[in-house]
């Protein structure tokens, strides 16, 4: 293994440029009922790997066209349009009065350099030859990382490539919203004078049903889940989609196929008792259900999703054909409009946003349709993206894309313990 040194050259806050007008310094922005879900006050971390573009040369200190310098300047400009990302959280989530104060304090930005090329570390493929801790930004000692809405670290490599480490607090934006902000930074980095999508803050557009009495606190038991990643070709996914259409006369998505396979493989590998209920949960975008109130041109970047939970007994998930498991998931997705409408009108007795983190719940996140893979700071789109949406008390599967030029779906999981990992891997490998 190559010995690699990552040196952080500067660490400081980047404020809006031009600076926030004095009249707005103390502006307080209301959060929506979804933003205020206590479970969303956590950091979403990811690494975005950009290979050397054919027209770019080696990184040279003092060059104003270095990725770190360009992105830093663009970030400052973007914060002028997105002042909440330069602000700070105030109030209490538990009390229901959390807000964002537009203080202009800025986003945390780190410039770093690695003494190797991306090829020397295998393009940052798994297993990672540079730890995530070295490539992700961390605030100064004693500072709560969830108190800063967004943090970035740009690590430049000797080949001209770079890795952008992004840490964003989920309270402020969902995946689509975070990608919208990063896209704005990229557009300004490429020299655009005006953002293609104007940001919309107005959180009053989101339904605000009566608050339900709090249930029992969630369990945060550590399970020791192991990481496993595999790539599924586009042809394999297309074959399953065709089979599903022939069987049920309906279309299914790549998400449906990949989620069903992971759910089935995990259920088989763990060996749950046949009668045990197993669940798969994912955050479904609900912007299309709020078209009457959200701007027609888009731009709303707050949390706008609904947690869809699909439930079946372990015996069905483990023993039925994959196509049948896909149908279970699709039937659950079909209930989204009705369930979201009931929640919005206050016609629910259990808060769907109060998540539980039990062993029999698999959380799935799809990163392929958020917009991160289309971001271009001037050196082309990312070669690949590594999300770190893992917590040891959550069984997680993340859908992404394999490094270019490969096609297909990358399934990144952390959902079974070491004692079950081989059987899980065998189940997944048999599928591909």
From Swiss-Prot:
GO terms for molecular function: hydroxycinnamoyltransferase activity. The active site is at residues 170, 376. Coiled coil: none annotated. Belongs to the plant acyltransferase family. Plants over-expressing AT5 have significant increase of ferulate in leaf cell wall. Involved in the incorporation of ferulate into the cell wall. May act as arabinoxylan feruloyl transferase. This is Acyl transferase 5. It comes from Oryza sativa subsp. japonica (Rice).
């Amino acid at each position: 293994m190559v010995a690699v040194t990552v040196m952080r050259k500067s660490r400081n806050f980047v404020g809006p440029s031009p600076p926030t007008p004095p009249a707005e310094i103390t502006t307080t922005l209301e959060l929506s009922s979804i933003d205020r879900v206590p479970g969303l006050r956590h950091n979403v971390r990811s690494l975005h790997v950009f290979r050397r573009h054919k027209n770019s040369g080696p990184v040279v200190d003092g060059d104003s066209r270095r990725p770190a310098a360009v992105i830093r300047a663009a970030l400052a400009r973007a914060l002028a349009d997105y002042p909440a990302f330069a602000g700070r959280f105030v109030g209490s989530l538990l009390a229901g009065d959390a807000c964002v104060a537009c203080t202009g304090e800025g986003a945390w930005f780190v410039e770093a350099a690695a003494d190797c090329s991306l090829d020397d570390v295998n393009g940052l493929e798994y297993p990672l030859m540079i730890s995530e801790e070295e490539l992700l930004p961390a605030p100064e000692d004693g500072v709560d990382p969830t108190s800063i809405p967004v943090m970035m670290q740009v690590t430049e490599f000797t080949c001209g490539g770079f890795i952008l480490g992004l840490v964003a607090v989920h309270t402020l934006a969902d995946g689509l919203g975070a990608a919208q902000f990063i896209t704005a930074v990229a557009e300004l980095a490429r020299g655009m004078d005006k953002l293609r999508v104007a940001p919309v803050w107005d959180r009053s557009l989101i339904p605000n049903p009566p608050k339900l009495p709090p249930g029992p606190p969630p369990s945060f038991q550590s399970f020791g889940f192991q990481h496993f990643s595999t790539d599924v070709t586009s042809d394999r996914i297309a074959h399953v989609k065709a089979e599903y259409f022939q069987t049920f006369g309906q279309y299914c998505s790549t998400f449906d196929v990949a989620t069903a396979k992971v759910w089935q493989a995990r259920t088989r590998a763990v060996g749950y008792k046949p009668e045990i209920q197993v669940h798969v949960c994912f955050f479904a975008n609900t912007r299309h259900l709020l078209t009457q109130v959200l701007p027609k041109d888009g731009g709303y970047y707050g949390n706008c999703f609904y947690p869809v939970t699909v439930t079946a007994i372990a015996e069905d998930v483990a023993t039925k054909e994959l196509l049948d498991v896909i149908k279970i998931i699709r039937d659950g997705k079909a209930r989204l409009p009705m369930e979201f409408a009931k929640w919005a009108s206050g016609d629910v007795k259990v808060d769907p946003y109060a998540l539980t983190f039990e062993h029999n719940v698999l959380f799935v996140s799809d990163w392929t349709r958020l917009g991160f893979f289309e971001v271009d700071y001037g050196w082309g789109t990312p070669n690949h993206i590594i999300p770190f949406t893992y917590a040891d008390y959550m069984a997680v599967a993340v859908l992404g894309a394999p490094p270019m030029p490969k096609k297909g779906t990358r399934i990144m999981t952390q959902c079974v313990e070491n004692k079950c990992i081989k059987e899980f891997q065998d189940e997944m490998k048999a599928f591909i």
